[in-house]
């Protein structure tokens, strides 16, 4: 483990099939001691980590950001082509879209305008690392609607702050969706 730099004290690891999810405290010939985030201690034989897979979060910790990848499911019945009036309203009421011009001969949909807005909004936030991937994509539609996958990296990697940042961003998106005459899909019987 140590010779191949697979594991170091201070690394955050998760081990599938065990309750280990925390910071490596100690590595010996017989055990790897992990302090879990609930403050319990897990001990795992080094052989387990060599013979099976585990996830080491060191790369994320040392990188420029922590990945956020979530989807918002839009109600398919609310997706439509934008009228000229809709586009003018978007430009007037949503400052990030003030200079938006569709490609020649293209009539954008309200879903497309929302995706454009999401990308512009994320790139305007200092908490988002725009040097890393930022991808907004429409995935295959499902019985739960049309998923808009939002993929970006938060500059802040501290768990509590990371959760707050992504929650605030997605709260904002949920609040903006009606401005695009869209609805989030909600299952009802």
Predicted segments — roles?
Residues 2-103, 108, 112:
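Soluble accessory domains appended to multi-pass membrane transport proteins
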Residues 92-189:
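Long, non-transmembrane cytosolic or organellar matrix-exposed soluble domains/tails
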């Amino acid at each position: 483990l140590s010779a191949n730099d697979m594991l170091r004290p201070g690394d955050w690891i998760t081990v599938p099939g065990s309750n280990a999810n925390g910071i490596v405290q100690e590595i010996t010939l017989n055990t790897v001691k992990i302090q879990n985030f609930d403050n319990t201690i897990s001990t795992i034989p080094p052989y387990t980590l060599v013979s099976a897979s585990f996830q080491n979060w060191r790369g994320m910790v040392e990188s420029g950001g922590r990945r956020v990848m979530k989807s918002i499911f839009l109600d398919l019945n609310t997706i439509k082509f934008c009228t000229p009036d809709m586009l003018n309203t978007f430009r007037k009421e949503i400052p990030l879209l003030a200079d938006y011009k569709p490609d020649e001969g293209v009539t954008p949909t309200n879903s497309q305008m929302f995706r454009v807005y999401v990308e512009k909004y994320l790139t305007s936030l200092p908490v988002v690392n725009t040097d890393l991937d930022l991808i907004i994509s429409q995935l295959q539609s499902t019985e739960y609607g049309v998923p808009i996958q939002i993929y970006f990296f938060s500059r802040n990697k501290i768990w509590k702050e990371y959760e707050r940042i992504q929650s605030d961003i997605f709260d904002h998106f949920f609040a903006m969706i009606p401005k695009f005459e869209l609805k989030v899909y909600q299952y009802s019987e």
